[in-house]
Amino acid sequence: MTSVIQKLSQQLGWWRTLIIHRFFPSVALRRNLARDKEDEIELRLLPTLVDPNRIAIDVGANVGSYTAALNPFAAHVIAIEPHPRLAGILRAFPAENVTVKQAVASAPGIRQARLAVSLVNGREADALAQVDHGNSQENVRLYDVPAITLDDCAHKPVGFVKIDVEGHEFDVLDGAARLLTEDRPI
């Protein structure tokens, strides 16, 4: 009996999370931010690291925990998330100073990226998503998404950049030469 109750509780927990993320994204962001502040100590440092007169960029924004954390401290936040479903959650973010873009290119002239999201038991495993370089495996869903370099992303000075893109950080930095030399963000 206990095993059945535990399984049911686990399933309801997953559904509850899904429903909250789908229909109440701002509640999900607040909950994630509260949890992340306990787990990720660097979030507590943001008030001292983020310049309130400059732009902050969250590359690999996922559902927006860092976006929400950056929002009170930056003049404007640009959240970049290539996964269309997660970008949709970010677009529902209830703040006027947040802009959502879908993907970051490694070089000028690249206007589209292909995202490969692995399927596990027929469901997308968001944590396993990565840029497809034409060598994707069978159990993936492909998305073509608009891309922009970090240099083209912001037209005002950028003071802070967070990059979490599952091993493609150097690709992101390749498209940020001007931003890094002129703006010198943290």
Explain the meaning of each model-derived region:
Residues 1-186:
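Phosphate/nucleotide-binding beta-alpha loop and adjacent structural elements of enzyme active sites
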